[in-house]
Amino acid sequence: MHERYVPADVEAAAQGDWRAADAYKTQEDSQKPKFYCVSMLPYPSGKLHMGHVRNYTINDVMYRYLRMNGYNTLMPMGWDAFGMPAENAAMANGVPPAKWTYDNIDYMKGQMQSMGLAIDWSREIATCKPDYYKWNQWLFLKMLEKGIAYKKTGTVNWDPVDQTVLANEQVIDGRGWRSGALVEKREIPMYYLRITQYADELLNDLDGLGWPERVKIMQQNWIGKSFGVNFGFPYELDGEKKLLRVFTTRADTIMGVTFCAIAAEHPLATRLAQDKPELLTFIDECKRGGVAEADVATMEKKGVATGFSVAHPLTGEPVEVWIGNYVLMSYGEGAVMGVPGHDERDFAFAKKYDLPIKQVISAEGQQYSLDAWQEWYGDKETAVCVNSGKYDGLRYAEAVDAVAADLNAGGFGDKQVTWRLRDWGVSRQRYWGTPIPIIHCPSCGDVPVPEQDLPVVLPEDLVPDGSGNPLAKSEAFLNCACPKCGAAAKRETDTMDTFVDSSWYFSRYTAPDAETMVDARTDYWMPMDQYIGGIEHAILHLLYSRFWTKVMRDLGLVKFGEPAKNLLTQGMVLNETFYREDASGKKTWYNPLDVTVTHDDKGRPVGATLNTDGQPVVLGGIEKMSKSKNNGVDPQLLIDQYGADTARLFTMFAAPPEQQLEWSGAGVEGASRFLRRVWSFGAANREALAARAGFDAAALGEADKALRREIYSVLKQADFDYQRLQYNTVVSAAMKMLNAIDGAKGATPGVLRETYGVLLRVLYPVVPHVTFELWKALGYADEFGPLLDAPWPKVDEAALEQAEIELVLQVNGKVRGALKVAKDASREAIEAAAVADDAFAKFSDGKPAKKIVVVPGRLVNIVV
């Protein structure tokens, strides 16, 4: 072995051995417990970032530790390869999205391999490959058969210049991101999946998951089970009697209704605008701008009076109808009751348009005022009805029951459970995605593609130009024959939401070569024992994947109903930011590698200059690594300079996996220095370590016993920390071990070999290359087999036994020293040793002991 640690040589050698042995190819094995651990598959954006490195290293550490403990472990990898960024890159570079995507996959796969990850590459998938998305199409057709998939009109963002549909994130301040045109809302036919059919199960099954409470709460809120009342305001129009339906969780405030607001797309709005140009103008304005709920929540609330009134269902009084830009047709009934006295949004709206405000609840000790909104106005916990006729004096629950009963008696409505969750619209008017397997025939209508004709293959040679969907212009793709009648027909040009692709990939990993969507191997591996990914996926991806899994179960494809037993949301990687600001307020951000920072005597940054010109830059603070702040660190540069093991060690040591990690160049150097110490000790002591000298534990001297006691004591803690995923303290334990071994004076070769072997196995899951090579070079592999499958070291409990123990010595309750006594010393012997100790003589002021308190194994307190 080399005297000096050369990471590039060490890592190349280890990876060569792993490739030759096909070390990470995994098969099902009923004789072992299985552990299936998955990192959320990456989007092939071009390069890995440090967040990827952290995520995959956590997964890899888990894999290696459990494999050493006898588990049949699996760590696969794939690519979430469809999506809008590929189309954007294609437009920018004039190349098909497919080429951009596959080139990125090749580069990023090479980066992963250089990290030494224990990935079974025989299971690799890319969601843009026909052999994968065929099953998206197949399951979509099954859902269509079962009524889970259906078609209806939906509202989208339409760019009138580019003639294309925009995603919510492509609408910036109401304008298209490319054209700058004012965005319109359009109603177009789209396919939806009935996720609401599973709402109760999605909510209730959260209780059985080992997921972070924060994620569970986010999903609960998104599903949004609400108990309220659905009712209607009666009206007559064009000779017909109808109800303007609304849903409310605050039926106790119904007597405070002073207006109703409806969405611009509501049928009543359309009818009322027929002969009122001012209403048409406002409706057109509402149709410009994003359709995202978040956009609606933050934009200025506007409205226009229709001049039409409905009747209050309980009093018969007229209630004016307004069209409001904050009411979404896609949520609830597309209409809301306005109670400005007790709803903050309605209060602001009423103040803006000078609408009546009526107080109908009060709270003890509070004074109601129309001047400004107060939080208690909307508090149902302290609410008591007032100015509400027969409901006066009732509290929230009583009032809701009474109002619901009266509405029901009048035929206007009743109690109802509703959900914030909406059916999943999966149609996307984009090119780079899974084609929806539908054919449009002039005679037969919408016809599903026959199963034997799947997959409908997406052409990979098209280059989008931003003006509509390229599929609609591709005659080769578009034109086909109707499967029913044989007439000329057109293919559906919409593609599926890319969340479809990521909703079941972890099941396909288990049977990547199956001629069916999944097979028996899937039930062996699934559900995932551990899923790892960022908190940003807490709602959409994780909720959709849970729904998709339940659909697969109900179709008889799998036996499980949840995709992942446990979830780890790793913390973000942070780094310093630096910038300069010009006269217009525009900031230019500089990478930390291009900046020199000065620190005060406590190590805090106090100033910085740009290396190229020596002029000052502003310290922007520590933020998440991102392209926008230019504060990322290229993992490849780190690996090239220090090696993959150093990158892995730093990311595991710097913080617990679930917490944020602050980047530190000094920390990276420290990790590298530690690995050099591990290697140097092995090289300097290779003769003793490779000698395979045995020893009689009972005959060992005190130095050997002390070293073994320390190593096995630390091993016990490290094992516990591995089990609870606290890898930062595992690394701390390894550092303690090295210090103990390196500092042991007079340790015999046999004990040195034993304890260093424990250190290598403890470190191996975190830094597999250097430990694998040391294990082999020092002869451990000849004795125990390659480190890949070496058994996890067992704690030698006998080594932890001590002839003497140390007790804290107190005089009058204050610590005054330490007392060494025989482990099995009697109480009398301990008391005698305590009063004979120099510390007692020094701190008792010559007074005799009145009382001696002995806490076995811990302390002695002498009271004088």
Swiss-Prot record:
Pfam families: Anticodon_1, tRNA-synt_1, tRNA-synt_1_2, tRNA-synt_1g. A motif ('KMSKS' region) lies at residues 624-628. A motif ('HIGH' region) lies at residues 42-52. Its EC number is 6.1.1.4. It is found in: Cytoplasm. GO terms for biological process: leucyl-tRNA aminoacylation. CDD domains: Anticodon_Ia_Leu_BEm (cd07958), LeuRS_core (cd00812). It catalyses: tRNA(Leu) + L-leucine + ATP = L-leucyl-tRNA(Leu) + AMP + diphosphate. Its main location: cytoplasm. ATP binds at K627. InterPro entries: aa-tRNA-synth_I_CS, aa-tRNA-synth_Ia, Leu-tRNA-ligase, Leu_tRNA-synth_edit, M/V/L/I-tRNA-synth_anticd-bd, Methionyl/Leucyl_tRNA_Synth, Rossmann-like_a/b/a_fold, tRNAsynth_Ia_anticodon-bd. Keywords: Aminoacyl-tRNA synthetase, ATP-binding, Cytoplasm, Ligase, Nucleotide-binding, Protein biosynthesis. It is an enzyme of class 6 (ligase). One of its GO terms (cellular component) is cytosol. GO terms for molecular function: aminoacyl-tRNA deacylase activity; ATP binding; leucine-tRNA ligase activity. Signal peptide: none annotated. Belongs to the class-I aminoacyl-tRNA synthetase family. This is Leucine--tRNA ligase. It comes from Burkholderia lata (strain ATCC 17760 / DSM 23089 / LMG 22485 / NCIMB 9086 / R18194 / 383). The lineage of its organism: Bacteria, Pseudomonadati, Pseudomonadota, Betaproteobacteria, Burkholderiales. The gene is leuS.
